[in-house]
Amino acid sequence: MNRRAIVLGMLALAMASGACKQKKTTLSLLVWEGYADPSFVRAFEETHHCKVSAAYMGSSDELMAKLRGGSASNYDVISPSSDVAASIARAGLAAPLDLSKLPSYNQLSPKLRNSPLVKAKGQVYGVPFMWGPNPLLYDTTAIDQEPNSWAALWEPHLKNRISVWDDLSTVYMAAQVLGYDKPDPAQLYNLSDAQLEAVKKKLIELKPNIRKMWSTGGELTNLFQNHEVAIAMGWPLMTNQLRKLGFPIKELIPKENTTGWIDHLMITAASQQKELAAQFLEYMIEAQTQKMVTDVTGYSPANPQSTTLMTESEKNNLHMDDPDAYMQRIYFWQDVPRRAKYNEIWNEVKAAQ
């Protein structure tokens, strides 16, 4: 072999090697807003020489539609909430987890970790990740007196000044106003036909006050920033975003209490990157990452060891000083046996003139 052939061969090998190094595996996520922020995802990408690509969902129904509509294979990791996590596990849409690959799993809150939501047939299908309420948010410069009830949204002087989530959570909220969470809050997720009709009537009465229904956190943040709304049902994510912008926002849980969620991380059954996905789950439930996620979202972490990295003020803001007491004020989402009927009622509310 002559010198020219050797040089050309070495050049070809070098080019091939360079191409391999440039090509990165992509881990695809379908998660709630804020769960793939570069501030904490970038370190995982660098360590594992991969790219994390995220699509955000606006509701649990959107997640279920995508998983059941043939696009499940497009995603490796999902973040279902407590209302659909069990359904996903039962339907075989998630892969069982090898807990030996998740050493931080045992650091998670026992109350969250031992929930039956993501357990089926002796297997664990998801890890608790973040939790929180759907609180009442209001602009302190636009609302003179602090509201203490969800019923404040129906006040006549708030015509065209409120926003609600385009989600079944608004159905639950109206049911609370009507007292259907008494004596058992679980009844919110299994309302009768008569109760759902009463909820529909109550929400149609609310429509003159609704400036816009929001579907993403950024949308509600903008509505407040532009002073289009004065009060809304929201997420702690919006409170966190608006406070960082210096906006005079306040968050509270009304006297009726509120609904809320426990978000989990799951690996889809169709994922072709299950090993990398498991490494991602471990990274996301480590104490240091949990702290970074709370910095972005304002949500409460599933790993209580993350509080060792927080100031006292941060712990108090996230209600990690006494999480059990705070959880008692949150009626965490449950499976809704008649979800199709709930959605039918909600769609009728939206269509009503």
Regions found by a protein language model. Give the residues of each.
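Extracytoplasmic ligand-binding site segments that recognize negatively charged/polar headgroups
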Residues: 79-85, 89-225
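A ligand-binding cleft/hinge motif common to bilobed small-molecule-binding domains
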Residues: 84-87, 231-248
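Periplasmic-binding protein-like
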Residues: 196-197, 202-206, 243-269
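Mature extracytoplasmic/periplasmic domains
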Residues: 259, 268-330
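C-terminal motif of bacterial Sec signal peptides marking the signal peptidase cleavage site
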Residues: 16-19
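Early extracytoplasmic/lumenal segment of secretory-pathway proteins
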Residues: 21-88, 221
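Conserved C-terminal helix/tail region of periplasmic/extracytoplasmic solute-binding proteins
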Residues: 323-353
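A bilobed periplasmic-binding-protein/Venus flytrap-type ligand-binding module shared by bacterial periplasmic
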Residues: 135-142, 177, 262-273, 292
